[in-house]
């Protein structure tokens, strides 16, 4: 279990530079390169709002925010959001989109490494990390940094990909190889995170895991495969099935 807390980057084939090339296509909702994130966003945001509690006026950090899809939605729901990411071009797209919308005064972005967050201890009421932990070799250090900047009594909410055979088949075999909705090497199975491993990382950082739940597409799997190939016209739901993706939250005493 402890091996996943810090994986040698030289052993993985993940290529996060893909995100630098997306540009304003971050906001193409149906057939764009991150259409899957848009499809999952309503369910993710709804779950996060539920476990975080009322968002109005609360400071929230989005770690690994990319083009700002989740950050903007949580700002729209009332949070005062700061999003961080290492992809400068993704942040530029996030800023352009935010500047043209109703949330421009309640969301801001900064280029930062999640392993060395540029914030003082106990800076945020809440933290979210969505579709990010499965890209981080040093999971333990990343979680410790998030715990450091979270206020006592705060909540860290997350979603990520489980390290199972089924997740490897669907995320890499189907999405990257078969239907090519995700570029090759966007993911590496060795960086997928089992719930027990994340629980260990959270505990070591002084956070208490409260729950994990599944995040799954609704409908028939074969019909969903056709929908994905045509443009990711899917709906997602919080379920009991954590075999592929799961979300959850932890608290800081």
Report each predicted region and the residues it spans:
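Conserved class I S-adenosyl-L-methionine
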Residues: 2-54, 155-179
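Class I SAM-dependent methyltransferase SAM/SAH-binding core
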Residues: 61, 67-116
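A C-terminal cap/extension of S-adenosyl-L-methionine-dependent methyltransferases
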Residues: 101, 178, 200, 204, ...
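A short acidic, Gly/Pro-enriched loop at the edge of an enzyme's catalytic core
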Residues: 115-126
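A short SAM/SAH-binding and catalytic strip from SAM-dependent methyltransferases
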Residues: 126-137
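A short glycine-rich, Lys/Arg-flanked "PGG" loop and its adjoining helix->strand segment in the class I
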Residues: 140-152
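Acceptor-substrate binding/catalytic loop of class I
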Residues: 160, 180-197
């Amino acid at each position: 279990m402890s091996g996943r807390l810090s994986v040698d980057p030289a052993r993985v084939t993940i290529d996060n530079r893909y995100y630098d090339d997306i540009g304003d296509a971050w906001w193409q909702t149906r057939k764009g390169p991150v259409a899957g994130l848009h499809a999952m966003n309503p369910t993710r945001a709804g779950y996060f709002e539920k476990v975080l509690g009322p968002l109005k006026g609360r400071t929230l950090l989005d770690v690994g925010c990319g083009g700002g899809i989740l950050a903007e939605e949580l700002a729209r729901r009332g949070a005062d959001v700061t999003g961080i990411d290492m992809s400068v071009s993704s942040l530029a797209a996030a800023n352009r989109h935010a500047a043209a919308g109703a949330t421009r005064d309640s969301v801001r972005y900064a280029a930062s490494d999640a392993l060395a967050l540029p914030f003082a201890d106990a800076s945020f009421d809440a933290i979210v990390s969505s579709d990010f932990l499965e890209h981080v070799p040093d999971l333990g250090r990343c979680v410790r940094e998030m715990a450091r900047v979270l206020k006592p009594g705060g909540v860290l909410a997350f979603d990520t990909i489980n390290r199972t055979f089924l997740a490897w088949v669907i995320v890499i075999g189907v999405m990257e190889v078969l239907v090519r909705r995700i570029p090759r090497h966007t993911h590496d199975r060795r960086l997928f995170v089992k719930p027990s491993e994340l629980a260990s990382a959270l505990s070591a950082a002084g956070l208490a895991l409260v729950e994990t739940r599944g995040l799954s597409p609704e409908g028939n799997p074969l019909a969903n495969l056709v929908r994905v190939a045509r443009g990711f016209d899917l709906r997602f739901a919080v379920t009991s099935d954590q075999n592929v993706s799961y979300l959850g939250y932890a608290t800081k005493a």
